[in-house]
Amino acid sequence: MHNIIEQISSNISGKQKKKKQIILSHTSRDVEEYLSMVKNRMNGGFKRIPHFVISKDGTIIQKLRTESYSDYFDEINVNRNSIIISLENLGWLEKVPVKNYLTNWIGNIYNGTPYEKKWRDYFLWDPYTDRQMKSLAGLCKDLVDEHKIEKKCVGHNTTIKDVEKMGGIVSRSNFDKRFTDISPAFNFEKLTNYIQDEQFV
């Protein structure tokens, strides 16, 4: 297993060893704010805790043991059967009128160069970093081997009926068209190639 910083939460909903899916999501805020929110259970009790968080610099933080689960999704069977990985990323971005910067839906400011692609009524996206991609690929490779999860990835751009019954690596956006994570800025082809490459570690 790759180097992982453990910050294990005691706020779990249950345990189940057998896992079918890895679900990718994003934080919608910088990693420090997100981890603080998870730790302090803000917003009336923050129960949507992922198993792992991967920062922009590729650092992996583990929040739950893989056999545990939280109320990340409203459907309990999805929570039981999945390992959830949240990537530090602001998601979709929009230009602030008059001012020369971009923000996401909660008002976090983005100062870099956005990824541009029209999808679900949005045009600008916070890019994922190469360090994130490599850390995610290494982690996913370990997890699919350990939990006998299928080595296949479903892209971001489609909502799939009964996606919870599928095996492999999926996105939060595959469950409901309201969700935009993982976004078009994420390269699923590269992730798949890393995971299937026996030389990649």
Model-derived regions: residue spans:
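N-terminal catalytic cores of peptidoglycan-degrading enzymes
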Residues: 1-81
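Short catalytic/ligand-binding loop motif for oxyanion handling, primarily in non-cytosolic enzymes
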Residues: 32, 62, 92-95, 177-179
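Basic/polar, cationic surfaces and motifs that engage anionic cell-wall
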Residues: 15-16, 95-201
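Short loop/turn segments at strand-loop or loop-helix junctions that form parts
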Residues: 85-90
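Flexible, solvent-exposed short loops/turns enriched in glycine
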Residues: 76-79, 92-93, 104-106
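Structural preference for beta-strand elements that scaffold enzyme active sites
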Residues: 21, 82-84, 168-170
